[in-house]
Design a protein with these regions (language model features):
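Intrinsically disordered, low-complexity terminal tails and inter-domain linkers enriched
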Residues: 36-76
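Helical "lid/coupling" subdomains associated with nucleotide-phosphate turnover
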Residues: 1-44, 72-199
Length: 199
């Protein structure tokens, strides 16, 4: 989903406010995108000769579904609605605002962060470049991202098998500070600022 939104943002089918546009509205920009560089390259390879002659239709379709909601759809049956984009904006704004408030809380700059650990399945399959493109993480974090997989499960195993490591974990937990974002006066303003997409 992050990759798709990032690609549509890059091609201009999604604007800075998250509005989904039709291929016809952005046809001048869209025609310049080589198929092999798009997320729909596989779709094009699977098309018949008749469909190949109208391959832009696969990339440009933006129609209404039964409820009258705008959506982007390709010939492979994959579609993205305006509501989906809105949900992405809400999620990425909350995370981006959280990052900015944590930096502010510790009085540090983005450049001082050495490594950004992404845990779980989410981190394993996320493109840091596309995450930055939609504003989920700062651009300066892209080359610092390290995917660590199921680190919670690994940590639990280590804690169960090694007393010294368990004590170290317990000490870290005792010294950990918890930042309740909803209780931060600046959160709402920061959240609203992060809702849009920078292009």
């Amino acid at each position: 989903l992050i990759d798709l939104v990032a690609e549509l943002l890059r091609t201009g089918l999604i604007d800075e406010n998250g509005i989904l546009h039709s291929g016809q509205e952005r046809s001048d920009t869209f025609m310049l995108v080589p198929p092999q560089e798009t997320v729909f390259a596989q779709c094009e390879q699977n098309m018949s000769e008749d469909a190949q002659s109208e391959k832009t239709e696969c990339l440009q379709r933006n129609e209404k579904n039964g409820s009258g909601q705008s959506r982007f759809e390709n010939d492979c049956g994959v579609y993205l609605t305006q509501k989906d984009i809105g949900e992405v904006q809400l999620a990425k704004a909350a995370i981006a605002a959280g990052i900015q408030l944590l930096l502010k809380k510790r009085s540090i700059e983005e450049s001082q962060i050495q490594t950004v650990y992404l845990a779980g399945g989410f981190g394993n399959y996320m493109s840091a470049e596309n995450a930055a493109r939609i504003g989920l993480i700062p651009e300066s974090f892209v080359k610092k991202v390290q995917c660590v997989g199921n680190i919670a499960g690994e940590g639990a195993k280590i804690a169960l098998l090694n007393k010294n490591e368990r004590h170290e974990i317990e000490n870290a937990v005792r010294n950990m500070e918890f930042l309740e974002l909803a209780a931060c006066p600046e959160f709402q303003d920061c959240f609203v600022d992060e809702l849009g997409f920078e292009r």
